[in-house]
Amino acid sequence: MTSSVLIQGYEEDDVLKLLQELLDAETSQSCADVGKKIAQLFSNDNPLVTLKTTGFLDGLERAARNKKSGFHREAAMIGFATVIKNLGTPSEVVFLPYLPTILDSFSDRGEVVRQAAKMAAQALLDCLPAGAVETRLIPSLISYLDDSSIKWPSKVAALQLLGSLASSSPKAVADYMAALIPCIKERMHDTKPEISRAAITCMLNLCSVVENNDIIPHIPKLVDCMAHPETLEACIKDLSATTFVATVESVALAVLVPILKRALAQRSQSMLRLTVIITDNLCKLVPDPAEASDFLPELIPDVERIAQTAAMPEVRALASHALTTLNKAAAAQAAKAANNSEKQALDSACKELREAVLKNTSVPHELANSIIDYVCDALAALYKSNNFDKDKWTSQLGVLYLSPLVGEELASQISSKIYDDLHAFYKSLNSVDGISNLTIEEEELVNTDFSLAYGGRLLLSHTNLHLYRGHRYGVVGHNGCGKSTLLRAIGDYKVENFPSPDEVKTCFVAHSLQGEDTSMAILDFVAQDKALLTMNVTRQEAADALHSVGFTAEMQENPVASLSGGWKMKLELARAMLQKADILLLDEPTNHLDVANIAWLEAYLTSQKNITCLIVSHDSSFLDHVCTDIIHYEGVKNQAKKLGYYQGNLSAFVKVKPEAKSYYTLTATNEKFVFPPPGILTGVRSNTRLILKMTNASYTYPNAKKKSLDNVTVGLSLSSRVAILGPNGAGKSTLIKVLIGEVIPQEGKVFKHPNLRVGYVAQHAFHHLDQHLEKTPSQYIQWRYAGGQDREVSEKESRKLTEEDRAQLQRDITVNGERRRVEALIGRQKLKKSFQYEIKWFGKPHKYNTWVSREILLENGFQKFVQAFDDMESSREGLGFRELIPEDIRAHFEDVGLPGDIADYSPISSLSGGQKVKVVIAACLWNNPQLLVLDEPTNFLDRDALGGLAVAIRDWEGGVVMISHNEEFVSALCPEHWHVEAGKVTGKGKTAVDDGKFEDLSEKDLKKIEAKATKKKKLTRNEIKAKERRARERELAWLQSPKGTEKPKSFFSDDEE
């Protein structure tokens, strides 16, 4: 140094004397004591500058590389360790360039030097902030390992240091995996066994940051495959047996792509086939093209070559399919990369920072530039991770590192200016076109920026939640966008920076009671609620709240299990009222509510002036009547999701965004459902012939005082379009259950065509799926229809054998004068207008099997066995038209609006409510049913899906019976109404359907339909003769009948009139 630098009264020579004292110390402890004295000296002034300008660090480096004195090398390492440990952050800026010197000391012959080097490396690692690990430490270690002149003990130390980062800085490791994997993989094949073993251990540690649950079980085999290429084939087979359903991010790709690339270079056609399938499946699960930007270029050339040159046609086809998927992802990534405005903004901000600092600092520019580079790298890392915590940008980064150069006040100004510029740029880049900037002078409840993710999927990215007291917000967006997840996150206080429960109290209201079987009395259920007990809500207050929503004193003593879906929802609302929430979160509140109760709910919500409501509902009229504002899930330029705010109800929102018209018109939708044609029913030539009929049926639930159904007679044909209407608890769902055989009436009969297949979607539709949440939708259908019959039907309560049924099998029946015992029904064939069944008799070989008519079996009490056999035969007949293979199942799901990738790869547990309903609808249609029974089908479906379902039902040729409180849906589809009240059913004839609900039918189309309905087919000459002959036969039969038999008005049948 040419001039002395003053440090709190010390000249440069004094610093160098202390350095010499450190080097001359006789013991390790003495070295440490001198090191502490030196650290104290520098901490009193400006360590970022003085450590370098005094020559202290250069002196330590010279001592560390002194080949003649082991004492000096040990003292230098102790000096590094002690000074780093005592100075801490931000001194790492000037110490990081000396990391190679510290690592070199791991190869020293002296054990004490190696131990001191270990202390120095650990001290440096401990003082590094998280951002520096990614921006400086990992690149330094990779560069160090790539240096072929480095001795093997130092490389082992560097590998161990890298491996330790997986636990201390997992995010930094995950972000840098694309560069780490190739570096460590090369070291795994080093000729020095010590380096190879250390690299394998390091790789296992690094791979522990992978969070993909599909890949985690395979990590040991994947690492072993990297180390031992001969295990490649076994590894690929192991991967091919895995169903990938979790989101695939860059860290998982970093591990898999090197192995896939090597597999794509093999000659084995079987291995190539498996590899392209894995590649295709993985790429479909990459949510963001940026995640794959470092890997796609590596795979595309190999997959393209296989698509053109593979020997097997199947492999070429699979490779072509995978190439299409890769190209789509690559195109999206290229489009995003083409927009380099972010890089330009960062470069501009760093240039501005550099100019401002260099203009106002007296520190040598070489040193100042090294500190500025460090700060710029850290700022860029914060920006790329979307971290806009102003304190981190200014106090914890800008002021901390720049104040030694320009003073604290100016450093704060510079860093704040950079933060404001980049934050404003980020907001403009991620802004949503058309979002209304609401300025409301009312009490503000919540105003916070946040992001929302579900599993590995980003639903909302750096958006704003802005709520005012007394406003009622309708949250709208397509199925699966995350509406219910947002409400749950708010209810659980998991939204970033959301006010605490002491400031803002939230209450989530959903269908959580559905499907529960509890015998607790309704009043006890509410009074013993844990949340209400903590609020000291009295039993009388609970009773009053229940009474306010319609529960009489008598009803409050009934068990919860006796309530219909609508009454359970009202029970939830009563609990919410008692919690006195500031924010009421309503997820599909109108599901299962009848018209009267919906009107009550509308009146209640609009009367609450101090409660803010967030409502997710697919009932457009409800949102119109209740909402003061609309929150819309908006797509933006870079495919992130934001919340857009619009004043007014749904009608006002549609005026601003015409593309949202599907909220009003059923066919103004982008979603299309196509139902498979119904199967042929043997012996049914007319669409008006009854195929399912209930006669004088009555049903009472166990322990219930009143009949749910009382002497009901109804019938259905292939042309039926029936809506079952009535208040909550009237018995609508019970009517359906009795009609389709879910339960057996205590009085009366139910006739069902033996070959009739019924597709049934229950009110609690999810109960079909509750036992299969780990399966994908495709796997669920494969399970349900494996073996040639519908397992859901065979598992119904009405199909399970009771003790009485088992006793029935032990009874003998008389056939052809002989008493025999039925062992099984094994066949069926037509017998006149009925059927006869082949019986295997107990204790007799098959050659003694006989055919017994359906009527005899029913008279002898074998109804359940006959019905089960009919169900099996009809299901087998329907499944004869389909192959239970993944390709057909995928196409079937796509026909009902569920994307094929979700059907193949997503577990049912991860699906939204609307997607689960689509799974249930698709599953019940798989065996081509002739009758579709829908209990509340509109629940959980968004407007697009609702429109698609309505059009599919309209165009379907089978019979349909449904329960729905959605008047718009019912009036558009069902000309026949059955009104249920107090167990009685009143049929109201066929009224005209409201075709105005469908925009895709023009006036010309409607005239064609009308003409088609009225046009009668002209009979041929032979058909006229046959008609007259049948009439004469009927007349002769009447003449031969007993005296007094009433003469028919006509001898022609109804079909022949």
Curated annotation (Swiss-Prot):
Residues 1020-1057 are annotated as: Disordered. Its main location: cytoplasm. Residues 440-659, 692-1019 form the ABC transporter domain. Keywords: ATP-binding, Cytoplasm, mRNA transport, Nucleotide-binding, Nucleus, Phosphoprotein, Repeat, Transport. It is found in: Cytoplasm; Nucleus. InterPro entries: AAA+_ATPase (IPR003593), ABC_transporter-like_ATP-bd (IPR003439), ABC_transporter-like_CS (IPR017871), ABCF_EF3_subfamily (IPR050611), ARM-like (IPR011989), ARM-type_fold (IPR016024), Chromo/chromo_shadow_dom (IPR000953), Chromo_domain (IPR023780). One of its GO terms (cellular component) is nucleus. It holds the Pfam family HEAT_EF3_GNC1. Belongs to the ABC transporter superfamily. ABCF family. EF3 subfamily. This is mRNA export factor elf1. It comes from Schizosaccharomyces pombe (strain 972 / ATCC 24843). The lineage of its organism: Eukaryota, Fungi, Dikarya, Ascomycota, Taphrinomycotina.
